[in-house]
Every structure is written in structure tokens, then in C-alpha cells.
């Protein structure tokens, strides 16, 4: 009957990705992304510079084998100054977000199916999420899912906008890539820490919001003194749900490659349409909000870049901004 066909149409609609904005470059993959900006100084490393997985072993910071023993590949154990560096980064990122006007949320790391559909991870990423089938719950791939779903089925008042939230969570992803040099060490994990920024705004303000978020993320990389670049993603490399996306990458001198540390996306009304997240304008009419989010920042590759780019013959130097959070200025 009618309900059956409505559900059938809805299921079809769930498989259609967002429509890219006009300013999205055409292209199929990473090679078609456009470099918008380069920043930070490239570091001069000692001749025998080591990749982070060797530094982690040398200074007893991260144990990948222990993680394999306890869980499996892609679940490292952080130890001593390695663990303290993680915690320092999380607190630094959250404090910086708060200084930029974001309200901190500590959400569940497990969500129901409705939440997965609300932000568009389902059905698109069904096979890439850890699914607890007995309870029909999913481990989150990003804090974007629980935080944005706070506003599911909500009508906001215009003066509540923009909503700016930040959240630190563990994130879980099944698709930790295959084997090879790109997935060694911290490059790709099944479980990792991340601080996420989420914004909900009026449609006419979302472009401005996007720019502010890009500035927030760039500020973090500048304070961490890391060489970085900003990419405008082409249509083929953008996520299923994004209308416009910029990636931040940091340069790993020891690996001689760029590592992605953040994606900052505008979803237009793609998520709010699913979430039924609206606001009441001055004329008392309800309109769909726009959602945006970005990592500020994802930890594993930031740790990798910090270890690799700051190695000296004496040890690993901690950037000035992090010293008060770490309680030490060298790993030796």
C-alpha cells in the first residue's frame, strides 16, 4: 500500500549522495583535488630521520604489537610520554575550540540506527562501521554522528543559531585500509581519538561558518608548527554527504608524504532533511538548517607528524603551545 511505497521511495532516496556546490572542482579522485594554500615551514631533519613507528619504539611511546595481542592490528597501546602527548593534544584542541566559542559535548560513542541514517553514515558506510547486532547499535566513526543527532526532530529558534559544538571521542572504523606503506604505524587505525567541531546555521550564513571553521583548524596547525596544505576536494573524492569539502594535510618529512588530519565540510540541507532539523525564522516559518563539521583535529596522524618533524639528535622537541599541556618539552 501507500506506506509500503513511501518506505520504498525513502530507501531509494537514502542511496543518493549530496549535490556538490558549483565551486567543487570536477574530478574522480585525489589527483583531481586542488591545492588552495600551503603553510608552515618545512623542517630540516637529521640525515638518519626515522618514521614515527620507529621513533615510537625507540622512545617507548606506542606499542603496536601489544595492541595486536590485546585486540588486533590497528589498535595501538600508548605508553608513558606517548599517552601523555595524546592527552595533551586532546585538551589543547578542546581548549582552543572553547576559546573560539564552541560548547563542549561528551556524547555516547555508540548510536542507534536512526542516528546513523540521520547524518548519512547509513546506508552508505554500513560495512565500514562496527555493528553490535544483538542490540542493533553502531560504534561511531566520528563524533559528528551523536552530536548532530542531538538536533534530530528539533525546531530551533532563529536566535539560537549558529549552534557551535565540539566533542572529543574515540572513533571506530572497520575499513582501516589494506597492507602496505600507507597504513603503517599510526597512518590508518581502527580506533583513534579525535576532536570534532559541529555547526548548525542558517542557510545564508553557512558559507561564512565554513570559512570560520577552516580558520579554526588552520590556527591549530600553525600553533603546532607543522607544515600543512589545504585542498579543495573534487566531486569524486568528497564524502557521500558533503556539498563542499576542504582537507587539511600535514607533511611527514620522514615518510616524504602528506597525511590527512582534517576534513571540513558543508552539508547544506542534506543531513537536516534526514534529521528534520529546522529553525523558525522571523516570519514564524520553519526552514531547514545547514550543518557543517570538521575534525579539529584527528590525533593519530598529528602525533605521527609531531614525532617525525620534531626529531633532533637529542630527542623529540615538543612545540611551545603543547608544553604546558604535556608537562615536558622533550621526549628523550
Locations of the language-model features?
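TRNA-recognition modules of translation machinery and tRNA-sensing kinases, especially anticodon-binding
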Residues: 38-332
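Extended amphipathic alpha-helical scaffolds
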Residues: 21-44
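Short amphipathic coiled-coil heptad-repeat segments
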Residues: 10-23
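Single conserved hydrophobic/aromatic residue that forms the stacking wall/gate
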Residues: 1-4, 9
Amino acid at each position: 500500500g501507500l506506506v509500503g511505497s513511501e518506505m520504498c521511495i525513502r530507501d531509494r532516496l537514502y542511496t543518493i549522495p549530496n549535490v556538490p556546490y558549483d565551486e567543487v572542482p570536477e574530478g574522480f579522485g585525489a589527483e583531481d583535488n586542488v591545492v588552495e594554500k600551503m603553510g608552515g615551514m618545512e623542517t630540516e631533519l637529521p640525515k638518519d630521520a626515522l618514521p614515527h613507528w620507529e621513533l615510537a619504539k625507540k622512545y617507548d611511546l606506542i606499542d603496536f604489537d601489544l595492541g595486536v595481542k590485546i585486540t588486533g592490528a590497528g589498535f595501538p597501546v600508548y605508553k608513558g610520554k606517548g599517552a601523555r602527548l595524546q592527552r595533551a593534544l586532546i585538551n589543547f584542541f578542546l581548549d582552543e575550540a572553547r576559546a573560539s566559542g564552541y560548547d563542549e559535548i561528551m556524547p555516547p560513542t555508540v548510536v542507534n540506527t536512526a542516528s546513523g541514517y540521520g547524518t548519512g553514515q547509513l546506508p552508505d558506510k554500513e560495512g565500514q562501521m562496527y555493528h553490535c547486532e544483538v542490540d542493533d547499535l553502531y560504534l561511531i566513526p566520528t563524533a559528528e554522528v551523536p552530536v548532530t543527532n542531538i538536533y534530530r526532530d528539533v525546531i530551533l529558534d532563529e536566535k539560537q543559531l549558529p549552534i557551535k559544538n565540539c566533542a572529543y571521542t574515540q572513533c571506530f572504523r572497520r575499513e582501516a585500509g589494506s597492507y602496505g606503506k600507507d597504513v603503517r604505524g599510526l597512518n590508518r587505525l581502527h580506533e583513534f581519538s579525535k576532536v570534532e567541531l559541529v555547526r548548525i546555521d542558517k542557510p545564508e550564513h553557512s558559507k561564512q561558518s565554513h570559512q570560520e571553521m577552516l580558520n579554526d583548524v588552520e590556527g591549530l596547525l600553525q600553533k603546532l608548527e607543522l607544515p600543512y596544505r589545504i585542498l579543495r576536494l573534487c566531486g569524486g573524492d568528497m564524502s557521500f554527504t558533503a556539498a563542499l569539502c576542504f582537507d587539511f594535510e600535514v607533511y611527514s618529512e620522514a615518510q616524504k608524504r602528506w597525511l590527512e588530519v582534517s576534513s571540513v565540510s558543508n552539508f547544506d540541507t542534506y543531513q537536516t532533511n534526514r534529521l528534520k532539523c529546522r529553525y523558525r525564522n522571523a516570519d514564524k516559518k520553519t526552514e531547514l538548517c545547514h550543518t557543517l563539521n570538521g575534525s579539529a583535529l584527528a590525533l593519530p596522524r598529528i602525533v605521527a607528524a609531531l614525532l617525525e618533524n620534531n626529531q633532533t639528535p637529542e630527542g623529540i622537541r615538543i612545540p611551545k603551545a603543547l608544553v604546558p599541556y604535556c608537562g615536558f618539552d622533550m621526549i628523550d
